[in-house]
Amino acid sequence: MITVRRYTDDDAVEWDAFVAKAKNATFLLMRGYMGYHSDRFIDCSLMVSEVKDNGKNPMLVALLPATIHGDELRSHGGLTYGGLVMDSEITAEMCLEVFAAINDFLRNECGVRRVVYKPIPWIYHSMPAEEDLYAIIKVCKARILGRDIASTIQMDNRLKFTKLRHRCVNKARRNGIRVEETGDITAFWHVLDNNLMAK
């Protein structure tokens, strides 16, 4: 049996531990990062568990980072994406059950009539994890309203720079711009924080 409940602040450690081992999660889905937007959105994130045997010791199998806006649930209103975060053991069949349970919970417990679902781009998965895309169409009768683009740089097979890109890099160097790798996240976080506040 699948059970669904809303996330509470008391669940933060369990949430983050699940995100750390999930097959399709990124740091954006950690509660510390998601909490950055807590003053702008009403959190309606869900925790989905499988209950076996006598109902004791439910096992967390999925998370749905989400915000609620009236009778609309968005996955996630404050992030670029926020689809179903899945355990590595989840099967397509179980994912169908998960979405059926989420649908029932949202309709009956939260008064949700519409869901905007932004899946986690496959480039961030540690292993294939698109069961949610199948289940949301099959169970929820979802339809695609739009597509977003996700870009990445493949570090082990870099594309060659164009001549224009070389000129731009040389110009940046002449003007004192440097790019360097560091383990100190403080400077990056300051730039990120300022950019997010400007939005």
Model feature map: region roles:
Residues 110-121:
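Conserved GNAT acetyl-CoA-binding A-motif
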Residues 17, 34-109:
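Conserved donor-binding loop and adjoining core beta-sheet/short helix segment
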Residues 23-45, 195, 199:
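Active-site rim helix/loop that mediates acceptor-substrate recognition in acyltransferases
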Residues 90, 120-123, 148, 157:
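Short, flexible active-site-adjacent loop segments at beta-strand->alpha-helix junctions, enriched
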Residues 123-129:
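Acidic-and-aromatic substrate-binding clefts and catalytic sites of carbohydrate-active enzymes
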Residues 1-10, 129-199:
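Acyltransferase donor/substrate-recognition loop-hinge adjacent to the catalytic core
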Residues 97, 104-110, 141-144, 170-172:
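Short, charge-rich binding segments
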